[in-house]
Amino acid sequence: MGKNKLEKFADMASYPHVFEYPYSAVDNVPFDMKGKWHKEFFKNDNPIVLELGCGRGEYTVGLGRMFPDKNFIAVDIKGARMWTGATESLQAGMKNVAFLRTNIEIIDRFFAEGEVSEIWLTFSDPQMKKATKRLTSTYFMERYRKFLVSNGIIHLKTDSNFMFTYTKYMIEENGLPVEFITEDLYHSDLVDDILGIKTYYEQQWLDRGLSIKYIKFLLPQEGELREPDIEIELDSYRSYNRSKRSGLQTSK
């Protein structure tokens, strides 16, 4: 029989590679590991890669297995979901994987300048009603700049046409370098082992016949960032709390 939420929370609290710092816990108290992830936790100088909004954490675990020469930190606020990947990585004895339970809105409180090399955004909520909540908005790009190396890599993998289109316009508006972009990942020439890792939710999107979009771009440290001023057609489907809850057809 599977564990209930309380049992999973108890497990998470005991795991040595899990850090739980929701907004209230770090509101006025500095995070001890900030600037010390390499030295005190991973005990190496390998690049640190974040997965923001990791859900169950399968992508982070998959990347950690593929790249033992990189360090991976999965971030989400839902502890019961993260338990899956946290448990799997612990049982596998993976030393290059950690989990951080916190609100992504305060992600810059956990990492020092230049401490992170890459960010993965895997199937993030497109937040169609409010741009500042989108993980590819300039609001979040400015936060990422506080800890990402200059020209650090950002990967967006999404089922949402709205999120893909918005991100594409944001990149164009700010002249950010794009290394690869496709509207249909699994019918492109970039299907490799990394992008072939499929999470629980991704498989459900594929089973419904939705194409998976992917953008890999760089975020320079310099330059003022501007939001794109354009109307984008909203996603029409409903699933996993991603719904078009108003009569609007487009949004900025």
Curated annotation (Swiss-Prot):
It catalyses: guanosine(46) in tRNA + S-adenosyl-L-methionine = N(7)-methylguanosine(46) in tRNA + S-adenosyl-L-homocysteine. Keywords: Methyltransferase, S-adenosyl-L-methionine, Transferase, tRNA processing. GO terms for cellular component: tRNA methyltransferase complex. Its EC number is 2.1.1.33. It is an enzyme of class 2 (transferase). The keyword Ubl conjugation does not apply. The active site is at 125. Catalyzes the formation of N(7)-methylguanine at position 46 (m7G46) in tRNA. This is tRNA (guanine-N(7)-)-methyltransferase. It comes from Bacteroides fragilis (strain YCH46). The lineage of its organism: Bacteria, Pseudomonadati, Bacteroidota, Bacteroidia, Bacteroidales.
